[in-house]
Amino acid sequence: MFCDQDDIWFDNKVEYMYCAIRCTDENMPSVLYTNAYVWCPLIGITGTATLTFPKDINSLLFLNSGIQGCASIFNASMRELMLKWDGALAMHDHLLHLLGCTVGKIYYENLPLMLYRNHEHNVTGNTRTNKNDIRTICSAMGHPVVCKKHYDAVDKFRRIYDDFLEDDMKYIIDEYLDLPNRSLFQKIVCIVTNRFRCYDSVSRILVKLFLKPYIK
């Protein structure tokens, strides 16, 4: 379990999550996520932090992130896998989520168990609380479809965990990694064919392709 210094945990968070992860197969690398309330000190609760719950790699890669590490708990088998990583990484929660979607197993409990403090100093930035808000797509036009930092982390992940990945996982990751080399039309075909999604939406990625730079 990771903890961030500026969040406020409910009294039952640790006990609830510990009991939940104990019910999973200890031999299978597993991670369990709960939700959180987004909390602004000057406003109060503005919504929930986690708006999508990806369980496969196709729905994770274009998020350019993972669910907050402070909302997770993982077993010893997952810990051993994470320790195989060598060198810098985009974010620890990104690695954890990649492993859960490929090598291990992910569990979700859509239950808020903490206040996720939203302010300008958050490492992951200010959290939007409406995934269907058109502003989340059209705002910050300079932001790319794919964050280079996370792209590089996926590339490194593919190499480090090659022996643990099934062939179908390798194929999907390789398709994602090759996208910067393809034309706009080829990108569209690849995204649709492989069912890449962002917030459970293929079309969301396609819209971004026309509005934003692909990677930087």
Locations of the language-model features?
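C-terminal subregions of glycosyltransferases and related glycan-biosynthesis enzymes
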Residues: 89, 117-216
